[in-house]
């Protein structure tokens, strides 16, 4: 889960199985009284705290991207740098034409990391230095 992006169809299947288990359905014809997305909300926001698998999967992929960025001397980082972004940094890396599924999965989480570590300065009103 932390190296590969889980396909949406598989996530939907997991959510369906989990919802059926929660609602104690032995067959698929019973009513689910609350949408699964609402059950996945936090307990403070009237949810039950179930994990949203898509978000969790992206978080795990972002964690791998962060490891590659922060630890350039790791064997994994050196291999990926030599193979996919030898002339730049992790945040400048692109998918390329012959990228592995693991690398494409990690790059899917790259925008999450960019939003989290780079400041986007607008008019400067809300930035205090």
Regions inferred by a protein language model and the residue ranges of each:
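A helix-boundary/hinge signal
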Residues: 1-129
């Amino acid at each position: 889960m932390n190296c590969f992006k889980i396909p949406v169809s598989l996530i939907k299947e997991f959510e369906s199985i989990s919802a059926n288990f929660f609602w104690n359905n032995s067959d698929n014809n019973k009513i689910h009284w609350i949408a699964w997305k609402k059950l996945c909300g936090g307990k403070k926001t009237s949810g039950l705290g179930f994990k949203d698998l898509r978000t969790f999967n992206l978080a795990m992929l972002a964690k791998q991207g962060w490891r590659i960025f922060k630890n350039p001397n790791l064997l994994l980082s050196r291999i990926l740098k030599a193979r996919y972004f030898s002339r730049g940094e992790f945040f400048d890396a692109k998918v390329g034409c012959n990228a592995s599924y693991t690398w494409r999965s990690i790059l899917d989480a790259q925008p999450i990391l960019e939003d989290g570590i780079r400041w986007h300065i607008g008019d400067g009103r809300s930035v205090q230095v």
